Each structure stands twice: as C-alpha cells, then as structure tokens.
Amino acid sequence: MASIAQAAKSLLLKEFASAFALSMRQFFAPKATLNYPHEKGPVSPRFRGEHALRRYPNGEERCIACKLCEAICPAQAITIEAGPRRNDGTRRTVRYDIDMVKCIYCGFCQEACPVDAIVEGPNFEFATETREELYYDKDKLLANGDHWEREIARNIAMDAPYR
C-alpha cells in the first residue's frame, strides 16, 4: 500500500508542484534587498552613530564642561579641557576631543550629559582613509551637530518619553 502511495506521489510530481508554487510566490513578492549605496534602509531613532556636539537655538554651544561624559567613558576616548568661568558663572570647553578609534559607541556619554550636548547622531557613513581623521576635535563635533541637528532633535524628541 505504501509503495502505491509513493508511486502516485512521484507520478503526479507533487513535490515539484509545491516547490514551483513556492518559487512563484517568492518571485512576485516585494524585494527584501537594498541596493546599499543608492538606497538606505530605515535607521532607528536610538541608533548610535557618529558623535556630535549640539548648540542652543541662539547659537551658543550646549556643553557646560561638567566632564561627566569624560568620566563615564569606559574606553577613555573623550578628553575635555574647561575654560575659565565666565561672568555669569558658567564654563565652556576650550578643548573637546574624541578618539573615535577607541570609542565603543556605548552611548554612556550621551546618557550622562545633563544638557544633551554630546549625542550620537544618525550618521553611519564616516569611513576615512587615514587613522588621524578619526580623532575628532571640538570644531568637527560642532560641525556634525550643525549638519545633523534637525534629525538629532527629532530623534531625541521621539525617545523623550522613555528617558
């Protein structure tokens, strides 16, 4: 009896028909592959990419030189030098360097910052040809912040209820 059932299956090509049906379903399904350099997939609002220093809407930098990010960095990739106190009692940084070679993109610096000055932005395309280009100074970080501010502000606003 089993041999008759086996013969019927092979004669009717049931496996072939089911495999062909599966192939046709996949053929007409939407593409799951992206052509990367030309198409980019969605990035989570919590994505931790290239670092940036933010400014207030009036153009003043946010960093108050509290050095919490430098203290919490497990890779010791951040170096900060604070300037003298200003007339209003606040301080600003004279030097703010991040060694991106050491950075492990943990996001602790962003979490520790009381004024949301240092953030990890949405940019993931920052490959370089030399190692020296991965040592970010204050000017580079502020330029990143100016360039990505709209997306950074949107991502922080989306994540605000969970902070």
UniProtKB/Swiss-Prot annotation:
Keywords: 4Fe-4S, Cell inner membrane, Cell membrane, Iron, Iron-sulfur, Membrane, Metal-binding, NAD, Quinone, Repeat, Translocase, Ubiquinone. Disulfide bonds: none annotated. It catalyses: a quinone + NADH + 5 H(+)(in) = a quinol + NAD(+) + 4 H(+)(out). Pfam families: Fer4_7. It is a peripheral membrane protein. Its EC number is 7.1.1.-. The keyword 4Fe-4S applies. Its main location: membrane. Belongs to the complex I 23 kDa subunit family. NDH-1 shuttles electrons from NADH, via FMN and iron-sulfur (Fe-S) centers, to quinones in the respiratory chain. The immediate electron acceptor for the enzyme in this species is believed to be ubiquinone. Couples the redox reaction to proton translocation (for every two electrons transferred, four hydrogen ions are translocated across the cytoplasmic membrane), and thus conserves the redox energy in a proton gradient. HAMAP family: NDH1_NuoI. This is NADH-quinone oxidoreductase subunit I. It comes from Brucella melitensis biotype 1 (strain ATCC 23456 / CCUG 17765 / NCTC 10094 / 16M). The gene is nuoI.
